[in-house]
């Protein structure tokens, strides 16, 4: 349903943001 789609999107965005922050903090960025 719509709510589950929104939840999945939010989870994906949160994961991407966390990965970006971790990448900047550790300096272990990979293209």
Swiss-Prot record:
Belongs to the frog skin active peptide (FSAP) family. Brevinin subfamily. GO terms for biological process: defense response to Gram-negative bacterium. It comes from Lithobates palustris. It is found in: Secreted. The keyword Disulfide bond applies. Keywords: Amphibian defense peptide, Antibiotic, Antimicrobial, Disulfide bond, Secreted. This is Palustrin-2a. One of its GO terms (cellular component) is extracellular region. Antimicrobial activity against Gram-negative bacterium E.coli. Disulfide bonds join 23-29. InterPro entries: Antimicrobial_frog_2. Transmembrane segments: none annotated. Expressed by the skin glands. Its main location: secreted.
């Amino acid at each position: 349903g719509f709510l589950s789609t929104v939840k999945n999107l939010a989870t994906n965005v949160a994961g991407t943001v966390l990965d970006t922050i971790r990448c900047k903090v550790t300096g272990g960025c990979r293209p």
